[in-house]
């Protein structure tokens, strides 16, 4: 589907992206680590985890391992060598949680992942259950010396990425903020900090009063008015009230422009729960239209990528989002076909496992909801911070770490099926996006278990090298980025599809069965000459993978191929075999 005048950034089409959950990637500066007892958060004091390799605990949100921006900088050469073109970071702004989807200050990078230059004040005493005397936290997160130093370090990260020809997308959470936010100040962090206005929780005279929807508004409700609207009822996630505050909208649009402009020069936004913003569809669409104008005016080449479940079409008409995180037309159909598992590992459906009709039907249905330029840069992930890791899904264990134990996430996994999924990912329309550690063999049930640390020093080198080779293949061939796609053949646990443009033609064949399969497929309808040769450029299997060239012959428009169990092959039409039909 094409909308006249709607374009998405060329660099984002088929770009290889890499998602980093910063606290769990690499600790490059231990001096900025959250300290045990630094502040009180959701029922307990926060805790610093000293063992980098310890599995996350059930209430992981207030436990910190120490990953930071310096750690990302330290590993940029690794990411560049892997073939990554775009780094997508989960939220980096000041926030009390490790996931940082509860923003405290949109103007600054959190010094706990940035730089702490002034570090004074006491930690909480054992048993203290509020933040009135969280002086160390107050110093770290409100002192301008720390905030500005953290922004400078972020600028360095962006410069180092751009120096390597790489880009960065950051996470924007504009539907809600956090209860620690300076506009609300429920935790009284800012009440005794210099240079800040009074928060709306504290006083009805706060300049931020209308940034939130309070259900009780009598004068005697303050100080301490906790009747504000929370996203899905969560009082730690106050919903922002765009309907009643033009100042709020203007401020957030200013933030949208600020971070994609000099000196920060971010290359795009990932928008959290973007369809939930506002209290009506009308307000939602109006806001995102203004957001697009603001971002594209500041940086026409910035991408706007939204988290979205369901039909995105009404936001993808050229005047709101560029694209979305691709659940319906990538993660879910591939997970069902290859594993039979739901993306949280909450359910197994035998009727979906290996079902080519369901797979093709789902893909056709959901892909038609995209504009072509949106589909080409849709974020195609196998895993992320909200769902179980794909490698764990290959063991078909239904449940979560709380019931099954964290060790169960790594038992009975099938790396060959993971490789099949990566072949899909690197040859399917969209921007293939790795979740940190997937390439190294990391496992995990749904959150928080999927937020384990990167296994530095104990990587699965077979998987790592396989990812590197598949990324290379993806980047070397434009057909995988912007070419056409056509289904060729489907049987139980067996699929073939074609990717092609005017210059190149590929077949991708997958056997997801536990036994070897020999299949004769009619392939000429996808533009292949009836007599031609195809050359193997990748073969993945249970024992590893191979890029050794192997020739297959198409005779009478048919390809006869044998694939071992749990294997995939990428075949390219030899240039000597005749012209490829036009797109």
PLM regions and their residue ranges:
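Substrate-binding/active-site clefts of carbohydrate-active enzymes
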Residues: 22-85, 92-263, 291, 297, ...
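Hydrophobic faces of well-ordered beta-strands that scaffold small-molecule active sites
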Residues: 16-18, 87-89, 168-170, 269, ...
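Flexible loop/turn segments at secondary-structure boundaries
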Residues: 26-28, 94-97, 176-179, 218-222, ...
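Conserved alpha/beta catalytic core and glycan-binding cleft of carbohydrate-active enzymes
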Residues: 180-185, 256, 263, 288, ...
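Conserved, mostly hydrophobic/aromatic
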Residues: 20, 79, 89, 106, ...
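Active-site cleft segment of glycoside hydrolase catalytic domains centered on the general acid/base Glu
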Residues: 238-246, 273-292
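Carbohydrate-interacting/catalytic domains
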Residues: 1-21, 27, 33-36, 42-43, ...
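Short, flexible loop/turn elements at secondary-structure junctions
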Residues: 21-26, 93, 110-113, 174, ...
